[in-house]
């Protein structure tokens, strides 16, 4: 209606003349201002072909079933026209929070309201939903913040809340001491990348738990880092010191040798602080799920899909993946 009032040539198509109270109100308003309205003839959809831009409002965010029959025919036709398509709230055929395997509108732009929808981040859709613009429609933020979601979108606002300004008199001893257990022969680069990231994120001190060969790479790439020999049965001296490390990173390029597994278990037994587990650290957990019970509180796991399936089990779609992830998080 607003486009017509701005002198755009608009043709609106509707499926039913009666719907929800909101639909009825808008439909009556459209008739009142004499918007060009036409009921869709599913047996003759050719009139849509002459559109320059298509605004998609066939279905809303409440959709919870597969698209079939005449609606599927309509969606496939719209996609085949290769016109510029703008979807409102979500492309028709895509639910706000549930994966549906049927066809959906492939939009050039999505104008969604208040917040991005969960499905926008599903692997099945993320490459197909393009150019999302979030519009403020005046919803009550206080009510919205009390609602429980399935996750939290990490953006600059979240990061800004975690930022702690540093005093001018601060020194490295005030900024935490991290332990990194990563890298093995042929994969030392993984540990170096992790070490650089730790320093970049603000760690004051960093110690690598590593073998003799790896030390040379560390001293050349990160001379400010310290090293400690990987533990053997003859040398468990570091186990008593594990408690001093404020965070421990485990896994990238680590391998799964017997000695690595022994050190991994020792860290979980001794640490009082969170651990970040990635790569081979996750593979070790997958081999011995009893180790999940020993993960310190607020530990973080960072699996890719293959690693996740090894310890969580298989899933068919993103909905099942989220259910598995939440179940494991609550359990451990």
Each language-model region and where it sits:
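Short, structured secondary-structure boundary patches
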Residues: 31-36, 60-61, 225-232
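Internal gly/pro-rich beta-alpha loop/helix module
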Residues: 52-53, 58-149
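Glycine-rich, charge-decorated loop segments at or immediately adjacent to ligand/cofactor-binding or catalytic sites
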Residues: 24, 91-105, 282-295
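Nucleotide and nucleotide-moiety/phosphate-recognizing core
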Residues: 1-57, 66-88, 263, 271, ...
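Short gly/ser/thr-rich secondary-structure transition/capping motifs
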Residues: 35-42, 68, 91-96, 159-164, ...
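Small-residue (G/A/S/T)-rich helix-start motifs and N-terminal tracts that mark the onset
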Residues: 1-17, 49, 109, 120-275, ...
């Amino acid at each position: 209606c607003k486009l017509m009032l701005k002198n755009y040539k608009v043709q609106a198509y509707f499926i039913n003349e009666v719907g929800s109270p909101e639909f009825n109100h808008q439909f009556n308003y459209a008739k009142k201002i004499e918007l060009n309205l036409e009921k869709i003839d599913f047996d003759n959809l050719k009139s849509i072909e002459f559109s320059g831009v298509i605004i998609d409002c066939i279905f809303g965010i409440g959709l919870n079933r597969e698209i079939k029959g005449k609606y599927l025919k309509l969606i496939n036709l719209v996609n085949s026209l290769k016109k510029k398509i703008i979807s409102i709230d979500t492309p028709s055929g895509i639910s706000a929070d549930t994966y549906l395997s049927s066809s959906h509108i492939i939009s050039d732009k999505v104008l969604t309201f208040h917040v991005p929808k969960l499905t926008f981040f599903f692997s099945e859709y993320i490459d197909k939903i393009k150019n999302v613009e979030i519009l403020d429609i005046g919803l009550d933020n206080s009510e919205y913040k009390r609602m429980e979601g399935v996750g939290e979108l990490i953006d600059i606002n979240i990061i800004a809340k975690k930022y702690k300004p540093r005093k001018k008199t601060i020194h490295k001893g005030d900024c935490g001491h991290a332990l990194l257990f990563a890298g093995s022969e042929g994969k030392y680069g993984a540990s170096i990348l992790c070490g650089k990231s730790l320093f970049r994120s603000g760690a004051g001190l960093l110690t690598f738990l590593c073998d003799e060969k790896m030390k040379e790479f560390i001293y050349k790439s990160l001379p400010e880092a310290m090293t400690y020999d990987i533990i053997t049965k003859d040398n468990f001296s570091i186990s008593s010191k594990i408690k001093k490390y404020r965070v421990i990173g485990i896994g990238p390029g680590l391998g799964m040798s017997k000695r690595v597994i022994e050190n991994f278990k020792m860290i979980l037994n001794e640490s009082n602080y969170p651990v970040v587990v990635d790569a081979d650290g996750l593979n070790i957990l997958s081999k011995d799920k009893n180790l999940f019970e020993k993960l310190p509180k607020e530990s973080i796991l960072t699996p890719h899909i293959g690693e996740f399936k090894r310890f969580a089990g298989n899933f068919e779609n993103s909905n099942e993946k989220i259910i598995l992830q939440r179940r494991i998080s609550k359990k451990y």
